Amino acid sequence: MRFDELDLENEILDGIDAMNFQEMTPVQELTIPIILQTGTGKTAAYTLPLLNRLVREGNSDNRVRSVIMVPTRELAQQIDMQLEGFSYFLPISTTVVYGGGDGAGWDQQKKGLLMGSDVVIATPGRLLSHIANSGIDLSHVKYFILDEADRMLDMGFFDDIMQIVKHLPQERQTIMFSATLPPKIRQLAKQILHNPAEINIAISKPNEAIVQSAYICYETQKMPIILDLFTNNPNKKTIIFSSSKQKVKDLAYALKRRKLSVAAMHSDLEQEQREAVMLDFKNSKINILVATDIVARGIDIDDIALVVNFDVPHDPEDYIHRIGRTARANADGVAITFVSEAEQGKFHKIEQFIEKDIYKIPLPPELGEVPTYNPQAFERRSHHRNKHNKKRYFKPKSKSTPQNNKGGL
């Protein structure tokens, strides 16, 4: 289905055309008509109908009209950039609200919120701080959107979100996007949604253009493998993902000692530092970015040739998000995952999830012997360790327990 088949304002269609968008993705095709009726991916699925409704309703001075809640400042910035493109021909104002930076950033955000903004894109903690300290009025918000809601809950934002909801009017349109539906998400949905239309879309598999492979190794062999890898491929634009800030710092330091063009991205960096690193990486001033999952979702850089998972991600969906940074815009890409003994069970779940046996690269002989790939043994070992702790992971079956009253979407 094409965008010009939708009942969108001409100025919005002009913005879509200027961004070279023509055909809708499945999530856009399913969600845009519903959002329009009731009130590059999922961001456009809600921003386009939102802009359309804001334009048709006309401007409203000194009021916040819509709030888009996101887990990270990086995603907030990306959505703001996409909104700028779509609304290029529209009289729409946006304010981006996230932590970090200096006092000037806080003052600028406060000014935008107090003067009124058609669209506020915010992280929960920062918006709650402005509500508490800046006298922000959200009583006229008509559209409340939660993007990556599951990730926000993983980061501990449930209470912040519920506090923000208390400042919103009862009559509003609420839209929630979530990659997964754990009990906590269903609880949130039950509390903030009213008779929602539920749309389920199959989780996408990795791009077929990505060549996926893995090294089965001991944990102590990972650093020698990475150094060997970049001795032979020093100029490939690469993201190396690790689940630990300390590992990110250690990796970046080790690669810099090899005179490689590398930078680190993690939550200890100030906002200005993060933006400078991403700009240098996008402009190829650095070739290798070592990062935590802070950049696994939503970073729009088309020419990344290689993704390395220094650690196996905890969830299969995180794996897809990580390797999805390569093979973009019809390009080819390579994804390599380092799998230690303890990570074999997690890696096997990824293979099951994507329904593919990932090729195991033989380790260079000079790096020594490698462990046997036997993930079932590690799964059995993990099950044995946890069999006495089931109450931590499963709800009691008693009807009197609060968990059983959470309901569904």
Residue spans of the language-model regions?
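Basic Arg/Gly/Lys-rich low-complexity intrinsically disordered segments
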Residues: 59, 283, 351-409
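Conserved helicase RecA-like core
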Residues: 2-371
